[in-house]
Amino acid sequence: MAQLPPKIPTMTTPNWPDFSSQKLPSIAATAAAAATAGPQQQNPSWMDEFLDFSATRRGTHRRSISDSIAFLEPPSSGVGNHHFDRFDDEQFMSMFNDDVHNNNHNHHHHHSINGNVGPTRSSSNTSTPSDHNSLSDDDNNKEAPPSDHDHHMDNNVANQNNAAGNNYNESDEVQSQCKTEPQDGPSANQNSGGSSGNRIHDPKRVKRILANRQSAQRSRVRKLQYISELERSVTSLQTEVSVLSPRVAFLDHQRLLLNVDNSAIKQRIAALAQDKIFKDAHQEALKREIERLRQVYHQQSLKKMENNVSDQSPADIKPSVEKEQLLNV
């Protein structure tokens, strides 16, 4: 009977887990509560082995389907930046001031809680709180058992760290958008919180950022319009080229035919010019021949008249002279 495991210790009030803070109590915490209920009863060896086995097994994986609660990460800070260009100067300044105020407040509150409670979980860690509790079961067995108040404090600190991490991410994005210039001298040794606050509170820099963004947007719009106009002109010219190219080819063919006809006409004109020259020369020769024949005829007529005068009387000479005059005319 001495080697059998003892009965379950009777507890006056059950130590139920607090689901409102989204954290399940570990097995080590339950065992410690049982130990406080029965201080005279020592933990047997089989319970220690069970606790060690559960701690090593739960440390190897992150989360299983049997876990009833899932810890969701907060949405990223870049979701609400789609309508960032629509803010005016006053809304832009008020948004930056609220972010800096919340960031500084959460930062100081986080340091004060870390000084009193101890190191807490980071918001970037994707493991669940139950995994952290399972990994730290061996240490909790050697230390004092935690109370419900400590669990509540851990949950509050984790939520505040998540909010502080989100604010830090937003402030980092704002600093990257502001395009800040490096600081010289002793001002460069200041902390990032004070420098980011000074940069954000500068209205001239904010206005310059907004003006640069608007000018860049206008230039992009102008470039897109110019590109669209060029594309339209190119398409119209291409359609005109496609329409006029067959007409140009037809006109080129006609031009070649006309050039051939023109060359033939030129050759004919040259031949006609040579024929005209020959005909002119022949006409001149004919004119000279006519003059020569006329002179010969006149001489023969004179000889006949002389012969007839010698043979005929003077009465017959007068009509012959009249005939000769008529022939000369």
Curated annotation (Swiss-Prot):
Residue span of region Disordered: 1-22, 98-204, 304-329
Reported function: Transcriptional activator.
Gene3D superfamilies per UniProt: 1.20.5.170
PANTHER family according to UniProt: BASIC LEUCINE ZIPPER 34 (PTHR46391), BASIC LEUCINE ZIPPER 61 (PTHR46391:SF20)
Domain bZIP: start-end pairs: 202-254
Positions with biased composition (Polar residues): 10-22, 304-313
Start-end of Basic and acidic residues biased regions: 139-154, 319-329
Descriptive protein name: Basic leucine zipper 61
Keyword flag ATP-binding: no
Residue spans of biased composition, Low complexity class: 119-133, 155-169
SMART domains (alphabetical): BRLZ
Lineage: Eukaryota, Viridiplantae, Streptophyta, Embryophyta, Tracheophyta
